[in-house]
Every structure is written in C-alpha cells, then in structure tokens.
Amino acid sequence: NDEFDQYLKRFNYTFKNENKETAGYAILKNKKIILAMDIGPSPIGPQSNDYQSGALSFEIISSGKKLISNSGYFSNKQNKLNKLSKSTALQSTLVIEDYSSCSFKKLKSLGYLVDQGLKIMNKNIVFEDNYWKISASHDGYLKKFGSIHNREIEFYPEQTKFIGTDKIVRKNKDKNVKFDIRFHLDPDSKVMKTQDN
C-alpha cells in the first residue's frame, strides 16, 4: 500500500534480495556478466496466456550484449507463431522427444493457456565473488516420459568460465529417449571453436 511505501522511504529502509530470485527467475550479476535462469513453476489459468515453456532455460549477457538467449515471444495470438514461440524448442534448455515441457490448450478469447504445467524442485542458488551456481529440476516430462530434468550452471568470474550440466533422471531406464539441448545465440554474437572444443 502507498502509505507503507512512504513510511519505508521516509525512514530510509532498503531491502536487499538475498536469495537472488525474482518472479521465478534467478538473476546473478556483476559489472560485466548477467546470468538469468527460469526456475519458476509454470503459471496456471489466464496468467499463463503469455507463458513460454522454458523451464530451466537461461540467458547470458556480457557487457550489455546477449550471448545466449531465448528466441523471444510472438504476442499476436491470432498468428501461428504465437503457439510456436511458447514451445520449449525455442528456449535455451533441454527438450525430450521434441515435446514441450508444458502442454497448451487454445481458448478463443485468451489464446493458448497452459493445460498441463510443471513444478520446480531442488532449487539452489549460490552467489559469491568467485563462484556462482544456479541449479534446479522440473517434472514437465515426468508424466509422458517418466523423466525429471536437472540443470546446473556454474560460473567462475575470475576465469570468465561457464560450466553447465544437464541430467535426465528416468524411472524406466530400459527405454531410451531422444533429447536435444539447445542454446540460442544472439544473431550478433560471434562464436569460434577452440582447440579443446
């Protein structure tokens, strides 16, 4: 409420976000690098009409320029690109058997809403001067494939080095699943192969 905000301002109260999580995103940053990862559950109902199924997707920004990003959102709900832009394949994350981690249903007035969502588990955020880590799991593939997706991204600021680990934990280990791990590079990014790959 407005009165409470004025009270806090008058007595110079400021609050620091110690857990580094805002609206379902972990955001770690220093003067040069920003690492952001989607670690929030999928919304439900009308709140999901603009949701992109990008659980555990991430973006890296260096000196104000995106290096790894998600593909963006097409907001015109009458266009086929709207549904496509909500798919997991267009996010920088792991995809099993070309299925999105959430399913959508179309409602004429609201567009595509999350029909079957996902939960986030095992969230962990570490933010120290010389070491950052964001890790979490989601159950978006549990019902269809009996699988949990775990992701961990580490950053070593002194070396400007990122290490990412994805794991698929499966109930039925007898059946193989096809998966892709996608990293969408900003069109202005320049990438080169190093000697150690």
Predicted regions and their residues:
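CBM-like, beta-strand-rich accessory domains located in the C-terminal region of large
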Residues: Y73-N197
